[in-house]
Amino acid sequence: MVDKRESYTKEDLLASGRGELFDAKGPQLPAPNMLMMDRVVKMTETGGNFDKGYVEAELDINPDLWFFGCHFIGDPVMPGCLGLDAMWQLVGFYLGWLGGEGKGRALGVGEVKFTGQVLPTAKKVTYRIHFKRIVNRRLIMGLADGEVLVDGRLIYTASDLKVGLFQDTSAF
């Protein structure tokens, strides 16, 4: 039985990475350094732009985060692909929250637009995921649109984020 809370702490997210939050059959979040959020502040089965589910999560920014030291030397910026991965992570987390079982895999994205950047001087990144559809058949899949904000300003959008849960990934 999934503990369907509306919010999750960093400790909860780390437990998900160890397979302890949604049980061993549920999807796992990655462990640090690839875990791209510090907390989930809202999860609902309704709401969002399509009234089919909504997730909001946050990442605290500080200049010591690992990616600022290598991307780029003398011009530190959070790689845009990490924001995209965070959105995929949240789609998979939501599928586990709904009770889905399997190993989460990103399946694609329709379009991504970058209109800003995350610098080491920022304070907080906010991720917003608006679910469009959940497929619960042989393959469990989530389809959503996402937004990334830095200190309240919209900087990335993604349409048609797709994540599936697989019982067997050997042929994937």
From Swiss-Prot:
Where does the source fall among the domains of life? Bacteria
Cellular compartment(s): Cytoplasm
Known SUPFAM superfamilies for this protein?
Answer: Thioesterase/thiol ester dehydrase-isomerase
Listed GO MF terms: (3R)-hydroxyacyl-[acyl-carrier-protein] dehydratase activity; trans-2-decenoyl-acyl-carrier-protein isomerase activity
| Pfam families the record matches | FabA (PF07977)
Active site annotated at which positions? H71
In which broad location class does this protein mainly occur, judging by the first location in its UniProt entry?
A: cytoplasm
A GO cellular component term found in this entry reads: cytoplasm
Subunit annotation: Homodimer.
Name the family: Belongs to the thioester dehydratase family. FabA subfamily.
Keywords recorded for this protein, A-Z: Cytoplasm, Fatty acid biosynthesis, Fatty acid metabolism, Isomerase, Lipid biosynthesis, Lipid metabolism, Lyase
Annotated GO biological process: unsaturated fatty acid biosynthetic process
Family annotation (InterPro entries): FabA (IPR010083), FabA_FabZ (IPR013114), HotDog_dom_sf (IPR029069)
Pathway annotation: Lipid metabolism; fatty acid biosynthesis
Q: Which reaction(s) does the protein catalyse, per the Swiss-Prot or TrEMBL entry? A: a (3R)-hydroxyacyl-[ACP] = a (2E)-enoyl-[ACP] + H2O; (3R)-hydroxydecanoyl-[ACP] = (2E)-decenoyl-[ACP] + H2O; (2E)-decenoyl-[ACP] = (3Z)-decenoyl-[ACP]
Q: What does this protein do?
A: Necessary for the introduction of cis unsaturation into fatty acids. Catalyzes the dehydration of (3R)-3-hydroxydecanoyl-ACP to E-(2)-decenoyl-ACP and then its isomerization to Z-(3)-decenoyl-ACP. Can catalyze the dehydratase reaction for beta-hydroxyacyl-ACPs with saturated chain lengths up to 16:0, being most active on intermediate chain length.
Q: Which PANTHER family match?
A: 3-HYDROXYACYL-[ACYL-CARRIER-PROTEIN] DEHYDRATASE, 3-HYDROXYDECANOYL-[ACYL-CARRIER-PROTEIN] DEHYDRATASE
- What protein name is recorded for this chain? 3-hydroxydecanoyl-[acyl-carrier-protein] dehydratase
The top of its lineage is:
Bacteria, Pseudomonadati, Pseudomonadota, Gammaproteobacteria, Enterobacterales
Q: Which species is this record about?
A: Escherichia coli O6:K15:H31 (strain 536 / UPEC)
EC no. given is 4.2.1.59, 5.3.3.14
